Amino acid sequence: MTAIVDIIGREILDSRGNPTVEVDVVLEDGSVGRAAVPSGASTGAHEAVELRDGDKARYLGKGVLKAVEAVNGELFDALGGMDAEQQVQIDQTMIELDGTPNKGRLGANAILGVSLAVAKAAASSYDLPLYRYVGGTSARTLPVPMMNIINGGAHADNPIDFQEFMIMPVGAASFSEALRCGSEIFHTLKGELKKAGHNTNVGDEGGFAPNLPSADAALDFVMAAIGKAGYKAGEDVMIALDPASTEFFKNGKYVYEAEGRSLGPQEQAKYLADLVARYPIVSIEDGMAEDDIEGWKAITDLIGDKCQLVGDDLFVTNVTRLADGIKNGYANSILIKVNQIGTLTETLAAVEMAHKAGYTAVMSHRSGETEDSTIADLAVATNCGQIKTGSLARADRTAKYNQLLRIEQELGAQAHYAGKAALKAFR
């Protein structure tokens, strides 16, 4: 009944108008699973490879017909007839078929599309929501959203070096209340920016992209919006940052071009610690560059007991890299991006390893997204307690929030909002 009878890949567009891969998996009983693959702008050097065609005459070289061909050809040939319930075996078959350490031959975008579509087809066959199929009966925790309300760095055309300024409504009683809180702050911030003469255009992830001179200036606007919306910063709402420091780490220095200064690893750690002391910042992602292990150790020693230090480019959802961080004591959290590693099995393994080591895990989107809401289900399935999926604008972002609203309603009295417990180890 759950044997795979067809796998259909196609080229679609993501939220930036670039091609990406979408896959349908059809089972013997007629069940269909569909998954669309996201794409990042600030990508880690250690991520699995996203296969692009490189034909400049077509989509400026960004086409994904080679990946689609891999889906419809080699991957279907290898997986046709296999049981969709055998997720681990299916993912391992694709990894071995690719034969490279970074999925560079067939493409992580091809492999991931199939991996997720297989799980969704199997869930459909059992008439189960994806979060229940993957997570079992214990999957009932709704995550605290990290809502990206000011964009900078690679996600916006403005001078701010830090990539994301986010709010976390930890004090809400439910996910739906947290979403309302975030929406009210988002719209209040828009009014405050307009009043101050700033533009309110949005970046790739739906946050505002004003021309502000520094991180402090952005944080001051966020703090003002929280208060004016009727919430208490540090109690109802916490702040999270994603400097995406690899993007401005040059020749051993963190170069803040807008501010005209450069900081060494120890100075960068002290600068971030100072921000944590002055603002209710409870999470910093990629505060140090992906290969600046000295810097990661410095910041972990300095504020690791009071701030969530999330490794994104550092760990790239890879258990080998995460194991090194755990062993050597740097960072205390991992960002989970399904397309950084390329299969559902490896994604779940990274979350499990993090939790066993006492690290937190944050389920995450990419800046190039689609209307696919799989990560909302995975956040609940893994009970990770936190999700990062952009702002309160752009349908590619709100699709994930809306799916979480549906899940919360479906769970009813069983639903549990993670709230402050998601960050209990900090503050």
Swiss-Prot record:
The keyword Signal does not apply. The gene is eno. The lineage of its organism: Bacteria, Pseudomonadati, Pseudomonadota, Alphaproteobacteria, Hyphomicrobiales. Mg(2+) binds at residues 242, 285, 312. GO terms for biological process: glycolytic process. InterPro entries: Enolase, Enolase-like_C_sf, Enolase-like_N, Enolase_C, Enolase_CS, Enolase_N. Catalyzes the reversible conversion of 2-phosphoglycerate (2-PG) into phosphoenolpyruvate (PEP). It is essential for the degradation of carbohydrates via glycolysis. This is Enolase. Its cofactor is Mg(2+). Its main location: cytoplasm. It comes from Rhodopseudomonas palustris (strain BisB5). NCBIfam families: eno.
